[in-house]
Amino acid sequence: MKEFDYVIIGGGCAGLSLAYELEINNKLESKTLAIIEPRAEYKRDKTWSFWKVVDHNFDDCVIKSWNNFSINTPSGSNELKTEIFPYQSIDSGHYYKKINTSLSKNKNIKFFKNIDEIDTNNSFIFNSVPESTLDKSKIWQHFQGVEIEVEKDIFDDEIIKIGRAHV
């Protein structure tokens, strides 16, 4: 079994961002990295949305950014504005392409799909794979949304609506 200085288990958003940060900060110049990820190819499969509270290296992957938002509840909605913490959405397809293009230039980085055993004696191991059973006492935040296309402009794309829509 080949030894690696670093092993990242899980090549999704977290694992790839760690690999990318190591690469762009020149931490892999004389080190080897194995990324263990079962998927055969990276394709657009998600959209990640978040409040931008710190600068990040993925502004070129942002597909939309909002400074105006509305919080909707059963009792009504409240429109708010933020100048310093925009709400942003990143397209996973752009994200995967950017990171994999960068990582593919370093011959010390290898991707593996099927690994049955890992020798952990001489490696730093980073595991970004969530537990298969979630502890019910922990908070799990997950939003589900849909992208729709309409024939007429009926939405204000300058404001993000958070919460249940009022019909």
Regions found by a protein language model. Name each.
Residues 7, 39, 129-130:
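Anionic group-transfer/hydrolysis microenvironments
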Residues 11, 21, 25, 102-164:
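Predominantly flavin-linked oxidoreductase catalytic cores and closely associated redox partners
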Residues 4, 29-31, 123-124:
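Nucleotide donor/acceptor-binding cores
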Residues 1-14, 34:
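Beta1/beta-strand and adjacent pyrophosphate-binding region of the FAD-binding site
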Residues 15, 42, 132-134:
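Glycine-rich nucleotide phosphate-binding loop and flanking beta-alpha elements
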Residues 17, 21-76, 94, 144, ...:
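N-terminal FAD cofactor-binding segment of flavoenzymes
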Residues 50-113, 119:
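A conserved beta-strand/loop capping segment in the N-terminal third of enzymes
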